[in-house]
Regions:
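Negatively charged, low-complexity tracts enriched in Asp/Glu with abundant Ser/Thr
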Residues: 1-11
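Short, intrinsically disordered low-complexity segments
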Residues: 2-4, 45, 56-58
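Alpha-helical interaction segments
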Residues: 3, 27, 63-64
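Generic structural motif recognizing short loop/turn segments at the entrances and edges of beta-strands
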Residues: 9-11, 33-35, 66
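A short, structured beta-strand/loop element
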Residues: 14-52
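C-terminal structural segments of small proteins and small subunits
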Residues: 51-80
Length: 80
């Protein structure tokens, strides 16, 4: 399960090898909350437990780190 490192804050950003058959996306967790964002274009797929304010914060973090996240995605998924 590739984890995206270097993004500040209390969140865990990751995807799984099983995700490589889908368009690029990332899962985000914090405590018992989870959400999934498509990366191209950036958009929320689903959320469980995060409020709108926190989802906006996550979206901003994704925008700032989008290039690094996509590089990690393609590096992992293109090797499969």
């Amino acid at each position: 399960m590739p984890r995206i490192r270097g993004i500040p804050g209390p969140y865990r950003f990751f995807f799984t090898s099983f995700d490589c058959g889908e368009p690029p996306h990332v899962h985000v967790e914090r405590e018992d909350k989870t959400c999934k964002f498509w990366l191209e274009p950036l958009g929320l797929v689903r959320s469980h437990g995060f409020d709108a304010h926190e989802l906006n914060r996550i979206r901003r973090l994704l925008r700032v780190h989008l290039t690094a996240i996509l590089e990690t995605w393609y590096e992992h998924c293109d090797k499969r």
